[in-house]
Amino acid sequence: MSGIIATYLIHDDSHNLEKKAEQIALGLTIGSWTHLPHLLQEQLKQHKGNVIHVEELAEHEHTNSYLRKKVKRGIIKIEYPLLNFSPDLPAILTTTFGKLSLDGEVKLIDLTFSDELKKHFPGPKFGIDGIRNLLQVHDRPLLMSIFKGMIGRNIGYLKTQLRDQAIGGVDIVKDDEILFENALTPLTKRIVSGKEVLQSVYETYGHKTLYAVNLTGRTFDLKENAKRAVQAGADILLFNVFAYGLDVLQSLAEDDEIPVPIMAHPAVSGAYSASKLYGVSSPLLLGKLLRYAGADFSLFPSPYGSVALEKEEALAISKYLTEDDAFFKKSFSVPSAGIHPGFVPFIVRDFGKDVVINAGGGIHGHPNGAQGGGKAFRTAIDATLQNKPLHEVDDINLHSALQIWGNPSYEVKL
């Protein structure tokens, strides 16, 4: 294979999956085949999409009810020749799912890139090992927290929040994705002030924390803004990838003048991936494509919290981010939303140690503030790695957290 293989979930009311697959393969490549003269067929053969797999799935009554018709469900795979497209994500996505995405009854499940095609993508600049080296933390999950309630607040409020989270033992603190450039907390001021706070905490407590600042602005201003952030001392760039596009992420990741990790936020991605019947699968969108395009971290809904993904999907995202690949470094999985200390054993059991545990309210909502919330999580992480049940840990911060949010992991064993 020198091109790309697309895997689709299709729904066909004519009950002929093979015919539907062939129509897609032709429609996204040469347009027609059987009516072409033999000589023209020979000339266009190397450009034709080839159906390489058709698998019928069991009938699904809920799907029939939703579509208001009886359909045959199936998984199909089509190989698209590399000759047909340039080696970039806009061309690849338009080739494999462009006008087909308007069908409303087809879901792009996966894209399998040839080795030749992979060479055109950067992958993470730092990856898991590089991030761990920055923090000098190699033996446990990382802990991340979020600034909360920053809109309309000044830089002093940001510094107080950042200090409390860092003292609590948080490894990474990230901006809220809805904090944009503003007069009260402009980009470079956040970075410079944040570095002063984090250096002070490091000198006092010996704990290193990184700050992920939100990269925002018009698309053609992003590189300049990113370079300003780097010059100001930014540790990590948070980026709302799907508000801009995967190719924009790749452009940032490939720029040698932006030598910092990039954290991909999933905002807007639900518009592409939420439906089970159409769109793009979450594992492909938030896993494989983000990693290929250069994200060092990928945030996605956890299977446990307030905006939950199905566990199978969340684990598939993580698999794409962390599986061995000779072309790409591994990206950090960041299962998010509604996470509190009682979920830590679940997260470690399901995602392993190479994961970032991301909490907002689970840290800020602690009765002892963000310092207590961070310490509760760190204690829960240590106990989990020792295979010690959380309710047996003698720690006031963890005990308070479990009283407030519960201990759903009571029986979990690694």
UniProtKB/Swiss-Prot annotation:
Q: Which InterPro entries match?
A: Diketo-Methiopentyl-P_enolase, RuBisCO, RuBisCO_lsu_C, RuBisCO_lsu_C_sf, RuBisCO_lsu_fd_N, RuBisCO_lsu_N_sf
UniProt keyword annotation of Transmembrane present:
no
In-chain residues carrying the UniProt-annotated modification N6-carboxylysine: K174
Q: Which UniProt keywords apply?
A: Amino-acid biosynthesis, Isomerase, Magnesium, Metal-binding, Methionine biosynthesis
Cofactor(s) required for function per UniProt: Mg(2+)
User: Which pathway, per its entry?
Assistant: Amino-acid biosynthesis; L-methionine biosynthesis via salvage pathway; L-methionine from S-methyl-5-thio-alpha-D-ribose 1-phosphate: step 3/6
Where are the active-site residues found?
Answer: K99
Entry keyword annotation includes DNA damage: no
- Which Gene Ontology biological process is one annotated for this entry? carbon fixation
- Report the GO molecular function annotations: 2,3-diketo-5-methylthiopentyl-1-phosphate enolase activity; magnesium ion binding; ribulose-bisphosphate carboxylase activity
Q: Which superkingdom, per the lineage? A: Bacteria
Free-text remark on how the cofactor is bound = Binds 1 Mg(2+) ion per subunit.
Q: Where does Mg(2+) bind?
A: K174, D176, E177
Q: EC annotation?
A: 5.3.2.5
Q: Which Pfam families does the annotation name?
A: RuBisCO_large (PF00016), RuBisCO_large_N (PF02788)
Q: Which residues bind substrate?
A: K148, K174, D175, D176, E177, H265, G338, G360, G361
Q: What class of enzyme is it?
A: isomerase
What is catalyzed by this enzyme? 5-methylsulfanyl-2,3-dioxopentyl phosphate = 2-hydroxy-5-methylsulfanyl-3-oxopent-1-enyl phosphate
**Subunit details:** Homodimer.
Q: What does this protein do?
A: Catalyzes the enolization of 2,3-diketo-5-methylthiopentyl-1-phosphate (DK-MTP-1-P) into 2-hydroxy-3-keto-5-methylthiopentenyl-1-phosphate (HK-MTPenyl-1-P).
Q: Which family does it belong to?
A: Belongs to the RuBisCO large chain family. Type IV subfamily.
Protein name per the record: 2,3-diketo-5-methylthiopentyl-1-phosphate enolase
Q: Which gene encodes it?
A: mtnW
